[in-house]
Amino acid sequence: AYITGENFTDFYNQSEGTLVLSADIAYLPTSNQAAVVFEDESSASTDLIALGYRVGGGSSGNLGSWYQGNGSQVAYFNHNAGITANTEFRQAFAYKKDNLASSVNGGTPQTDNSGTLSTSIDRVKFGGYYADTMKSGHIRYFKYFNKRLSNAQLQGLTTQ
């Protein structure tokens, strides 16, 4: 499922924002099971913000938060979260120029203080991205804030 056009541009902020996800995955062997992706429709592999199970690779049980802009990796956070099948996880990712962070299940946010943001992201996609799709599982909820929330807020929003 996609949100595009004015339905997307009316709420998306290119300069800063925060994504919050609650989901579970039933099938663990496959990597790159993105639950939510903000991407450039014309170049989905070069401009994206992705959250989910083993996004960007990573080992079994890991969650990834990945920001790619203008064909280059801006930030990649690989959380060793110990995810098991059919168990809820909560993940948050915040972006602003030179101020990116990701938190999982109430853990201390991982941060990156450098990076130029994409100006061409134009849609949100649920359940997959260019590399693969969610094989089995549920997106319990997704929230988007059009400002960069604090690291403490990221941690609080992901506490179970």
Language-model features: where?
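Surface-exposed coil/turn segments at beta-strand junctions on protein surfaces, enriched
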Residues: 12-14, 84-86, 117-119
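Generic recognition of flexible, low-complexity loop/linker segments
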Residues: 6-10, 78-80, 88-91, 129-131
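Beta-propeller domains
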Residues: 22-24, 39-41, 50-55, 92
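Aromatic-rich beta-strand patches that line glycan-recognition/binding surfaces
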Residues: 31-52, 64-69, 104, 155-158
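Extracellular glycan-interaction surfaces
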Residues: 52-115
